Amino acid sequence: LTAGIAHEIQNPLNFVNNFSEVSKELLDEIKEEIGKGNMEDAMEIMNDVIQNLEKINHHGKRADAIVKGMLQHSRSSSGIKEPTDINALCDEYLRLSYHEIKEKDKSFNATMKTDFDTSIGNINIIPQDTGRVVLNLINNAFYAVDEKKKSGVEGYEPTVSISTKKIDNKVEIKVADNGNGISKKILDKIFQPFFTTKPTGQGTGLGLSLSYDIITKGHGGEIKVETQLGEGTTFIIQLPT
């Protein structure tokens, strides 16, 4: 994992260093052009510097996101288990995720469905950590349905659902979407740190890895995925009660 972290942080740092060096050279050119009285040429070069600074900012934020993700990884096993209403937690994070995405993209729209087993009652979990997992899975589900909608599938209605069910001495949580599904070629990689199918800057590839650790190591549970290409994906969490 350490090698992976180093590699992931090195990439954006290389960009930061390269664009910084180029910008310094461009500033020297600007000084020369101003000295010659060529203000128009100087302004053109200045625009290149501005673009470089935007790229430096972008890659700096990328490195920052990786570091924050790794700090979450290191904290994932901490916390105190307490009796928690899992149905209320799932419902809360479903709506939280939807409204956060809607705030960023006013055109976003999706149907939300819930099916909660009221016989579950409270279960002993670390609510902040479990909430983080549920939120991550729901965020991914909304992302998946939005991507499918943007691809222009006729008559498509983006839908994300979350359900709970008591099975013997376990509680099962399902987060499902009717997005594009996950290719079998990458299915065995999705829980690996830094693996992501999202464009650069949109995901660190740490969400599912962190979720896996929280459920398996932090709670002694299981997390698995069922998917059908073109039809959608369901993540299934099983927690001991």
Provide a role label for each language-model segment.
Residues 46-53, 80-95, 113:
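A conserved beta-strand-to-alpha-helix junction within the catalytic ATP-binding
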Residues 148, 198, 225-229:
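A short beta-strand-to-loop motif within the catalytic HATPase_c
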Residues 86, 181-189, 203:
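Short helix N-cap motif at coil->helix boundaries in the Bergerat
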Residues 210-220:
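Conserved glycine-/histidine-rich ATP-lid loop and adjacent helix of the Bergerat-fold HATPase_c
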Residues 150-173:
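Short beta-strand-loop-beta element adjacent to the nucleotide/active-site pocket used for signaling
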